[in-house]
Amino acid sequence: MKKIFFGLFIFSGIFSDAQIIRKYSNEFLNIGAGARGLAMGGAVISNQNDVYSPMWNPAGLIDIDRDWQGAAMHAEYFESIAKYDYIAFAKPLDNNGGVFAISVVRLGVDNILNTTQMIDSEGNIDYDKISSFSQSDYAALLSYAFRPGSHRLSVGVNAKLVYRNVGKFASGYGFGFDLGVLYNADNGVNYGAMLRDATTTVNFWTVNQDELSAVVNGEEFNPAPKDKMEITMPKLNLGISKNFEINRDLELQPEAGLNIDFTKTAAVISTDFASITPYAGAELKFQDMIFVRVGVNRFQNITDIESLKRKVSFQPSAGIGIKYQGLTLDYAITNSGIGGSNFYSNFFSLKLDMGDFRN
């Protein structure tokens, strides 16, 4: 039953006859990657400096200066109904000091019940006609980071290719670009900015009308949408952080910032022009070996179903990490942030840094 409702949610989001510009188009690319960043509530816009950077701020790749890095992450949502995976590789380029990276992201839901053929043209129900299908979102990111003259300033760019598939019903291709900037000030403060979908990201859909639609008693259900193109508008993430040395063994790095969506949403600050959501997170590091992290984000105004009163919800997160030489294992846990939901998701990620192994 859960997968039936999940499938209906997917259909309503993808095949609706809404405007071409949709609020949650390619939303899977906003999840992030790496249990470190997810445990800190996304508070890594100005301090993520490894192979996970393309998903947060590609300018952070510039700190990979010795050898290549590889990473992988796996997570499951809604009691394992949805599965999210990430794999990436990054390497500095010897000729000009820049860093190149390639990342692949997948979010998929398998075994969704297909009931489009359950009722025949005369209105008779045949449960044997129920089948199943999978819905998957894929993205490949090609990233490049460089320093445009100043050693304190770095710039990064993502080129994104998106492929989305909804069983036999529809598939779509999209492309777009992200732009990131990092600045490390003299006083140790780090400033970061990430403009997602900087030129807008465009998806072109192909719909299989024969598989999607159903005719019952002469009336057509699930007609193909009129618009075959959807546009993802830019989003701006801003962050500021600083690393504090508590003593010889302990360091604390907090970050705070704003996520700005150029459309009207349920964010705590929302106008017709933009919606602004604050976030914050911190990492406590012991001897660069053990890490404890917390974060909070996704503040939004919601209506309580029982009392019908307006209130603010948010998404807390936490996690730990352990590092040995060039191998880092991270874990994060977070909930959906919807009305105090008890649905928690677990994230595991593994990073290999050959620069640490060989030095």
Residues covered by each model-derived region:
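Sec/Tat signal peptide C-region and signal peptidase I cleavage site
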Residues: I14-A18
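Sec-dependent N-terminal signal peptides
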Residues: I4-S12
